[in-house]
A protein has these predicted regions:
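Beta-strand-enriched cores of mature, soluble protein domains
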Residues: 1-154
């Protein structure tokens, strides 16, 4: 099997779905990036260098497990796609549940979720694997989502 490892930083926002089912639809984009992590006497730091190239597109639906209005402190499910261009799209769904909660008192939120890769199209047609997401949402509703993926291709 071939293994693909990736780290990406997606930026975007979620909006309520128009159908009234308490589903939020998120859409975000991530550029090509080179990450450098450095451990020093002062601690650890990461730098990101944006590279020329296409952007990946992340589209998902998010719903609280109890199907109530989406809010902090409530476990949720998220499913959707990540498109890497040229018809190469990953499908994913939640492993367990995701959660998020306030950070401080300025309206910022932090959360995390794990997704299972469920195939896709193009290169990812029979892909399996796991993607982790550590995300933040600011008071204005803008999100930043750090992904780490370990994908296996047959």
């Amino acid at each position: 099997m071939r293994r693909i490892l990736y780290n990406m930083v997606f930026r975007g926002r979620g909006e309520s779905a128009p159908d009234g089912e308490n589903i939020s639809i998120t859409k975000s984009f991530a550029p090509c990036v080179r990450f450098t992590t450095e451990i020093t006497a002062d601690g650890v730091d990461m730098r990101m260098e944006e590279l020329d190239g296409p952007k990946a597109e992340f589209v998902s639906k998010v719903q609280n497990i109890d199907r109530s209005e989406f809010a902090a402190g409530k476990p949720f499910r998220e499913w959707g796609t990540i498109s890497f261009g040229n018809g190469n799209v990953l499908n994913f769904d939640t492993v367990g549940t995701g959660e998020f909660s306030p950070v401080g008192d300025d309206g910022q939120m932090q959360g995390g979720i794990v997704w299972c890769v469920e195939g896709g199209t193009g290169l990812f047609e029979k892909a399996t694997g796991i993607i982790t997401s550590n995300f933040g949402i600011d008071a204005a509703g803008d999100g930043i989502d750090y992904h780490t993926g370990v994908i296996y291709l047959p």
